[in-house]
Structures are given as C-alpha cells and as structure tokens.
Amino acid sequence: AKNDIKTRFACSYLGIIWAFVNPVITIVVYWFVFQVGFRSSDIGNIPYILWFASGLIPWFFFSEAWNSATNSLTEYSFLVKKVVFKVHILPLVKVISNLFVHIFFVAFLVLFFIVYGIEPKIYWLQIIYYSFSMIMLVISLSYITATLVVFFRDLGQIMNIILQFGMWLTPIMWQIDMIPDRFMWLFKLNPMYYVVQ
C-alpha cells in the first residue's frame, strides 16, 4: 500500500502532498459556494464547514478507494499475468493506500472540532465503527467491480458517473430533513447515508 502511494505520485514535484491537496481544495471550494455563495447557515450549534466536512471526508474515502480498487487489476495487469502472484490482494492494497489519507483527514477534522470549541464526547468513538463498516463495504464492492471491469472496461467510466450522482444523492451538502417522509426510505437504501449522518 505504501509503494502504491509512492507510485501514484512518482512523477510529480509535490509527490504524496497531492493526495492531501486535492481534497482540501475541493472542501474549500464547496464550502465557499454553499456558505458564502448560497449563504448556508450553521447546522444546530455546529459550524457549517465542520458539518459539511464531516460528510465529505468519508465520501472522499469511499469514492476514491472504490474507484481505484475497481481498476486495480487492469492497472497492475503486469502482475496479474504472473501465475504465482496473489491477484486478490490488489483491490485490498488500493483500499489500504486510500485509508492512510482518510485517517489523516479524520484526525485533522477532530482537531478542527476541538479548535472550534467543541469538546470530544463519548459518541465520537462511533467514528471507529462507521469507518470499519465503510472499509468492509468498499472492499466487498471492489472485489465485485474489479472482477467485472476485466471483462467490461467501460465499467470504470460508468462508475465515475455513478459516484457523481451518489455524492449529490447522499446528504452531504444538504440536510436530510428536506426530504419528505414518504421518500425517506429511498435515501436510506444508500449505505453511505448512515456513515455521513
């Protein structure tokens, strides 16, 4: 997993820093658009930037890990052709390499909550449970899609579209209270609904 991270950014001047710069810029841009542009207010007693980042950071991990793990067999096709190589570890390597970045952002987010004067509470330990559940979900989905993409290469592009729709259909930038009760069950079919909530 460590080697995968190095390889991904090997030809760039900033190297692994790009793994952190892109999500930060995305968060700042969305925050500016929604809070400054659309004047979104704080959610309860939680500043909007914290509420928003709490949903977007898990989504970053979910989408990046699933997308990269899906393409792992085609990306490392030179290894797949080796008979003695254990192919099944490739999607797992991609998930773990994305997990390193996710852990950094979760720690950074916790620090931000403390800086904003929000004291740690016992229920913050739920982060461990939901992170584990999300990792298991990504690994399960990745084994399915990584197998299918070998036979249907367009799946990688289709997944990009699905993940775009998924981000907007998950209550990350909007509150779930906006949805009428009769449609709530549809949104609860999305596993990431429970993580970002």
Show the residue positions of the predicted features.
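Hydrophobic transmembrane alpha-helices and immediately adjacent juxtamembrane helices
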Residues: K2-Q197
